[in-house]
Amino acid sequence: MNSMDRHIQQTNDRLQCIKQHLQNPANFHNAATELLDWCGDPRAFQRPFEQSLMGCLTVVSRVAAQQGFDLDLGYRLLAVCAANRDKFTPKSAALLSSWCEELGRLLLLRHQKSRQSDPPGKLPMQPPLSSMSSMKPTLSHSDGSFPYDSVPWQQNTNQPPGSLSVVTTVWGVTNTSQSQVLGNPMANANNPMNPGGNPMASGMTTSNPGLNSPQFAGQQQQFSAKAGPAQPYIQQSMYGRPNYPGSGGFGASYPGGPNAPAGMGIPPHTRPPADFTQPAAAAAAAAVAAAAATATATATATVAALQETQNKDINQYGPMGPTQAYNSQFMNQPGPRGPASMGGSMNPASMAAGMTPSGMSGPPMGMNQPRPPGISPFGTHGQRMPQQTYPGPRPQSLPIQNIKRPYPGEPNYGNQQYGPNSQFPTQPGQYPAPNPPRPLTSPNYPGQRMPSQPSSGQYPPPTVNMGQYYKPEQFNGQNNTFSGSSYSNYSQGNVNRPPRPVPVANYPHSPVPGNPTPPMTPGSSIPPYLSPSQDVKPPFPPDIKPNMSALPPPPANHNDELRLTFPVRDGVVLEPFRLEHNLAVSNHVFHLRPTVHQTLMWRSDLELQFKCYHHEDRQMNTNWPASVQVSVNATPLTIERGDNKTSHKPLHLKHVCQPGRNTIQITVTACCCSHLFVLQLVHRPSVRSVLQGLLKKRLLPAEHCITKIKRNFSSVAASSGNTTLNGEDGVEQTAIKVSLKCPITFRRIQLPARGHDCKHVQCFDLESYLQLNCERGTWRCPVCNKTALLEGLEVDQYMWGILNAIQHSEFEEVTIDPTCSWRPVPIKSDLHIKDDPDGIPSKRFKTMSPSQMIMPNVMEMIAALGPGPSPYPLPPPPGGTNSNDYSSQGNNYQGHGNFDFPHGNPGGTSMNDFMHGPPQLSHPPDMPNNMAALEKPLSHPMQETMPHAGSSDQPHPSIQQGLHVPHPSSQSGPPLHHSGAPPPPPSQPPRQPPQAAPSSHPHSDLTFNPSSALEGQAGAQGASDMPEPSLDLLPELTNPDELLSYLDPPDLPSNSNDDLLSLFENN
């Protein structure tokens, strides 16, 4: 049997032992804590251990909620494993998800109140002074009770998994329980559980008296301190954690380094070598360590990796020391480590530097004294280390690979010395002398048991800024804010980024990003399980990571621009559903294909909208009962309810979604069976982009406007006899007075528009109209109250020309005669004064005939609207997707000028890529296609009722519209060129109405029953006629992976039958 087989066998034997202990309430906590530590390393989830691990987890899922066991700890354990479900077989992964959700539900019910009582500002790792004192060793040596005491640097058991504990940093796991590296046998190399012979483990055994202290030895005997002799449970270390730079005393894994004789921060002499246990196993582990080093370096820690990749800040810390390279999240120590004296060189730099002997063996160097590059000023005072260094040759340099940045819970490990305070230049390789030496307790571990250190419940402010190695945000909560002044090594250039607030306090205890956790009401002081910054929810780094530093994820400029909301055809992901009566917590799962997730992240105009509405509201206006709280993937979301029931806003989830499985957890304190919930894909173009699209596609040429006005004159004369258009009695209608003020804002119209079916000449301001319909759009003309859906709007070039001609004057009205000649009506103080044609006014303002007018330059106007789609040089406003965007150059996503996409148009995909239909209009497919598609009249009467449907609130109805028209905005669709194309706007959702598109094709597929939209979740119930549930399938998309293809109804029906929903993996 080779060493690896032996290691596997020993590990499985240990797991079997833990399984037995998990069934006993007296040993459950210790056993679960050890297992949680072990699961902190991704290697724990290798197939050779799966069967044994699942046996343990099966027991946890069964007993955790029983009396005498620890539900919170059991949930965290399952959550950590569930976050790595991709490493399990499908069957095991399904069991994990189910267990995790079940325990999460029970945990919420049991601890909801208590969680909210935690003070919000409390740092996760700050134990109260009293607790620190209680941590005093009960054994003969100071570390006696270490293993299970809640040491300052350990996480409290009741701490949400979101907060990372010290032990977590290297392995990238959040060990939320009080697991300690030292106390935890898992850190002991002797322990078979060290997969791959944890690099740390090796020096820990024989050479490190500190680790092998009786306590460790005792691991084989029984839990020291806490576990009385009567307790047989043996806690063995499973995966020791690698050293933390500069953490001078973490026994095995920290600066003291596994090898450090006094690894626990206790003088070596206090721990007799006699304590060494299983030297042979240790040796084997050490041997494996070298082999595992490579794997370790590249391994990705569940949480840590996510954090890292998410912000990409820490891809690597620049070389900290001449020899230091941080490559992976695990510090791989290359080979067996001999006893490294606890000497001050544990800091990363020193480790990398090779731990010069002088630094190692001599007494700790003063902070101000120069020291060899490799020696860390704090070397000696690592956590819990006595201030002196114990001489001990440091066998070799331990390159620290990639030190993970600390999480909020673990403020700083080593490296404290580098910071502005420490005078270490931020430059990577050098750490000039820092401040005067002082016993550095590692700020992070309050109350460390360092002899010289006062045990304060808090993390003493580090003298140095760790900024350069750690993200400042992590230290937000602490008084010592690390300015992060220099991540000098931060390759990412995050360097002086102001610390992001650590939302820690608001995150409910949620063990793993992907797992639903009982949502604590936002505001609870529980730190997020995963990340200090709510950045990352997805447990696995998505292809494209949205950077969501703020709870509401909106894209960067998301708040800068107003957006319209239109449901996308066949875009219902979770059909409208009710909650079970009196069910306090319910989980609703949906899946996103990686390609769909990527597209959502790329396009700022696409969103996953989750809303609640009253079951009797046909318009499906958003209405959230006061008792409802929503959490997605364990991230609580804030619901905007506004001042009244008409101002409620739907939730947008894409920023908290992840590829694959996603869980929406709804918590209610009172029954809300009268409401329905629906999750759907919506198109949210910015008002600006819609304006640009309308200008390009729905500009009614002056000659058409004139024809329409003349027709109105004749029809009015015929229908109302001698009544003028304005309703005035007169001989014969010789002129019409038209106000230049918008009936919505009562200000001068900037861009005159009216609905396609409107018979009046009076216009309203297009931008004001779009803004009016942003939230709960009714899409009704403010002049005649007829339905004026987005696709049916027309920009009147003739009126626009009049406005331009007198833009610098203060006229409020103009008169237009039957020949369409016009002149301004002077503002009269005396109403009795007639507007005599021969009078001064007439002389000053001549009547202008259409032929004399200079029409406005549409392209200039479009460009003036700002970042337009590619067609125009200006990039569209980030927040909005200009129709241009879509149209942008026809198909180019124009760099997403309007999108918030961080990457711009991802992959350079052109809009075309997304749209199947050929762009019919001059503007690429966007509008035109959709519009055209839209154009085809929808058959559903509902649409009329739903004109607003276009609005976000009426997603379904709008969906209808949106469906066919999925991107009205993107299409700017209304702009379809067919000015005359009679739209069936009323029936069609706003976007489809006019489009002459019909002419282009009457996609019947576009039609889709609003109700169906409502219910048809993936829709595809298919029949647009079906009352509610059915959604029309999209015309076949040639490439179902092109999420957007479904968005724009193609000009030509495609032959593929994929519905949008097909893009979403349903359970």
UniProtKB/Swiss-Prot annotation:
Residues 112-141, 327-542, 868-1067 are annotated as: Disordered. Keywords: Activator, Cytoplasm, Disease variant, Intellectual disability, Isopeptide bond, Metal-binding, Nucleus, Transcription, Transcription regulation, Ubl conjugation, Zinc, Zinc-finger. The keyword Cell inner membrane does not apply. Residues 837-1067 are annotated as: Transactivation domain. Residues 431-440, 510-521, 868-879, 981-996 have a biased composition (Pro residues). There is a cross-link at residues 91, 834, 843 (Glycyl lysine isopeptide (Lys-Gly) (interchain with G-Cter in SUMO2)). PANTHER family: ZINC FINGER MIZ DOMAIN-CONTAINING PROTEIN (PTHR10782), ZINC FINGER MIZ DOMAIN-CONTAINING PROTEIN 1 (PTHR10782:SF7). A zinc finger (SP-RING-type) spans 727-808. It holds the Pfam family Zmiz1_N. It is linked to Neurodevelopmental disorder with dysmorphic facies and distal skeletal anomalies: An autosomal dominant disorder characterized by intellectual disability, developmental delay, poor language acquisition, behavioral abnormalities, growth failure, feeding difficulties, microcephaly, facial dysmorphism, and mild skeletal anomalies of the hands and feet. PROSITE patterns: ZF_SP_RING (PS51044). It comes from Homo sapiens. This is Zinc finger MIZ domain-containing protein 1. Expressed most abundantly in ovary and, at lower levels, in prostate, spleen and testis. Weak expression, if any, in thymus, small intestine, colon and peripheral blood leukocytes. Zn(2+) binds at residues 758, 760, 781, 784. Interacts with AR, but not with ESR1, NR3C1, PGR, THRB nor VDR. Interacts with NOTCH1 and RBPJ. Interacts with SMARCA4. Interacts (via SP-RING-type domain) with SMAD3 and SMAD4 (via MH2 domain). It is found in: Nucleus, Nucleoplasm; Cytoplasm; Nucleus. One of its GO terms (molecular function) is zinc ion binding. Changing residue 91 to R: In NEDDFSA; leads to altered positioning of pyramidal neurons.
